[in-house]
Structures are given as structure tokens and as C-alpha cells.
């Protein structure tokens, strides 16, 4: 919310979205902010599905993942801000979607609310055997938010021409021993690709992505769930 403005394009009391940092107040010339004039979608959505997490999902799965109708897509951290949107976009585009999340409650949310085809609980003792079973026909796109041992296993299941999108590696961030992939020759055998993506590379297209995802929300095709905390 704008508290004070000397900018002719923004008025005091306007709500905006943009890159302001994790802080109480920011001073800006307005170039990186967009005014929110929307009485159909919540303002909070512009921090989530219509903000940076949503843009990451949109460009990651569509531009980098290059999904097409009939693809099998696996998404790690499927209940998270990015993964939840990735899987829903893949479903909109006609893909079979397998999510990976931690715990029964998250997996239930992924399948019942977000309508993924399957969700595997990585906390289960038989997780890797379940993963092998669900991926036995090959994986066309793996959207990776986790890295580590899971990424290494997913390399075994990729199809010819598969695309692996590296968005994050949350299993490795606080690890004393970084686990790198040893099954990387699968990329060679399957003529597959593994590429990192950074959402800022697509800044010029944010408006287009925001409009399309907003339409999906209004059509009931895309759901979001924001957790709001005070303080």
C-alpha cells in the first residue's frame, strides 16, 4: 500500500505489486511496481500465484519445460507456492501430473484440491518403490525444487528428449554434505536436458503471464492458498 506519493502514476492509498524487499517500507521511483486494480481476485494473490512464485511456475514449466498435451510431469515440493502452480498449469495443458510432497495432509491437498493425478509422500518408507511404479512409463518433464537424492533418482526415470527444470534445491541448502547427481549419463542416453531457470529473466513478460493466470483463476482452473501471519 502506498503511504505517500509524488509520482503522477501512483496515489496515496493505492495497492501495488512489485519488488520491494522484505521490509516494512521501501522508497521507489515506481518503475518496478504495478498498480492493482482488481475487485475479482484477492490482493494477496498478487504476492503468490500472480506474483513471483506464480511467474516462476509459469515460465519454468511452459518456457523451460516446454510441456505439451500428454506429457508426464513430475513436480517436487508440490504443495509449495511454486510447485502447486506448476502442477496446475501442467494439468491445464493436458499433462499427467505426479506431485511429491511431505506428509499425508499435503498429499491430500495436492490431489483433492489441486487435482494432480497422484501425490507421493517422500516420508513413506516405500517412497522410492512407489516413485518407480508411477514413473515406469517414463517422465517427460521433471520440475525440481528439491535437488539431492531425489534429483538423482529422477534421472533414472526420464524419457527420451526429457526436460529437467532446476528451480531450487531445498534439500541441500543447509546440508553439510552436498549430494550431487551421479546418474547424469541418463541425460546423454536419453538426449535429455537439465537447465536452471531464474524468473527475473522473463521480467518483460510478467504482464502477459499475470493476465493469463488471472483468467485461469476466474475460470476456476487455477487455485491458490495464501497463509497470512501477523508480525
Language-model segments: what does each one mean?
Residues 48-125:
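Mid-domain Rossmann-like dinucleotide-binding core that forms the NAD(H)/NADP(H) cofactor-binding site
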Residues 149-222:
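Glycine-rich phosphate-binding loop and adjacent beta-alpha segment
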Residues 17, 74, 120, 140-143:
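N-terminal Rossmann-like NAD(P) cofactor-binding module of classical short-chain dehydrogenase/reductase
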Residues 19-33, 205:
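A structural motif shared across PLP-dependent enzymes of the aminotransferase-like
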Residues 126-136:
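Short amphipathic alpha-helix with an adjacent loop that forms part of the alpha/beta core around
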Residues 1-22:
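Glycine-rich beta-strand-centered segment in the early N-terminal region that forms part
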Residues 11, 42-43, 66-72, 136-137:
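Short helix-loop-beta connector
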Residues 137-144, 162-163:
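Short SAM/SAH-binding signature in class I
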